[in-house]
């Protein structure tokens, strides 16, 4: 959340918060953390942020230049560093479900890496377009309209509550916060705000939690730490396809995008990308939960079948309701293309007559594509298209081969394709690439593999093997990259 200063020195003219990183839990609780560590629970009208009183002055991450945020791994765990006099104050932010009946919350842990004590103000204010009509302090909690908005892990040293006639930042930074908890503040226009000011010794840390519902427990004792949450997300990706390419940034984006898709609003195209990247169970759950148009849901179901050929996904109470999907679409053209693909599924279910009807309805109609609609699906689709593009008779591997990738190793494991699960690797012998591949085909039909980004003359219909390709025409790998011999192995 960025703010402008007006000429009188009062610093607040609210502007809409930038889109940030979603964090959340399995029960549907979601919040957005922006690049300055401001947390907004989705569906609420308020945000929670923090300010730091250093030796020289107060610092607000939303307006300071020296703020750096990183996402160390695939998990939605963020580290935001604010430079203050003498060192950094570091905020680590994640979402977790508390022990017992605590429920879900966003947890923020602030670590004081400076050699001196600081004070931290944990502030609650209305978001742009939102309202806070009543705010009150209750010990370690701030309540918005009677519901817990934030809880700190220790007794505050000071409190500040304001209405529209006062500025919360001005009160806190000007020393106006008071020792005793003030009476609750009401504001008809929804501009009430408040802060808890907490001392933070040097080399120490504190936690606060932004809960989904009322919370009275101590955040430091109630929620798992960030490392445990990150390990949980890593376990969720154990079945996902993996890629290792010379572009390390792009390699890291794939698992992050898979996590982000599981926290995003369920969509049909999101379900397809989860399936393409090996997360079948999550794909089925996403497609079952989406409210996208019926035709898109049917098309997505057809793509899921093409990518995995798993009849169990369409059976039982936890499976996709095939009959409902088939009956619902108003767009008969899109439906026909999807039905043609699902005919094989109907055969597998022993519904030969329905399968024949589906093939007849789909005569001459191809399965529609579902274009990406957001950053995670765009990233995953772009990368999968580069790594394995469906051709008229098989798969084209490495359709794009940037010069920066030449000479670097490439590994792909467990990517789902319409022809089977695919894995391959590229190793280099000087300026010549060696390709190792394995395609676990869905059926016995031949699948032609090509590598147009490396050797346009190469093709094979063998399901597995290795081959030394020709040197890329007119392109020389960097001499600094050591050649490595092809090494066999499994890709799944």
PLM regions with names:
Residues 1-255, 280-283, 368-380, 384-385, ...:
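Terminal accessory carbohydrate-recognition/targeting modules of carbohydrate-active enzymes
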Residues 128-129, 287, 359, 366:
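A short hydrophobic/aromatic micro-motif that marks alpha-helical segments and, especially, helix-coil
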Residues 184-188, 232-349, 354-360:
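Substrate-binding groove/exosite segments of carbohydrate-active enzymes
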